[in-house]
Amino acid sequence: MPDRLFLFAGYDQDCIIDDAVIYYVKTLSKYGDVILCMDCNCPKKEIDKIKKYTIHTIASRHGEYDFGSYKRCFQYATNKNILKNYDYMYLVNDSVFGPTINIRQTLKNIEKTSTDAASMIVSKHKTHTFMESWFIRLNKKVFLSDWFSNFINSVEKEENKFDITIKY
């Protein structure tokens, strides 16, 4: 089985880690390591509900949306010098409920593509095509590159969600 690292971004306005997030993270943890970053100040009792399924959990309001959470997860993995241990890194968030199907086959399918990056869904806009950021697979060539490190570490708080969508 390939070694996978899932960077999981979550948010809850009430600072709870709900059953849907626990289920999603628990399922992913069967197929790789999970680092979770919640963009809210979850109390310890909430973190305790999920920490057995993660290698690290961060729960702190940063206001940078999902990419800010991905940034913090990536920084943790970089600081712990563990990125080199993985074949694939996934950017996953709680925007969707799931998985509702066996995720193992989905992972196998997305990993057999010959591209450096792939996603579960590719959408077409009027002017461009883009990968939906709620489930993106990156290969080692990408996530160990200076380009990706510079990109993800440049994420900052934006004025509104539209700016985030366009920029990231």
Q: For each of these PLM feature ranges, what is it?
A:
Residues 98-128:
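Conserved donor-nucleotide/metal-binding helix-loop-beta segment in metal-dependent transferases, i.e.
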Residues 66-70:
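Conserved donor sugar-nucleotide recognition element shared by glycan-biosynthetic enzymes
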Residues 63, 96-97:
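Acidic metal-phosphate-binding loop of nucleotide-sugar-dependent transferases
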Residues 121-168:
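Catalytic core and acceptor-binding pocket of nucleotide-sugar-dependent glycosyltransferases
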Residues 1-65, 75-84, 88:
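N-terminal anchoring/stem segment of glycosyltransferases
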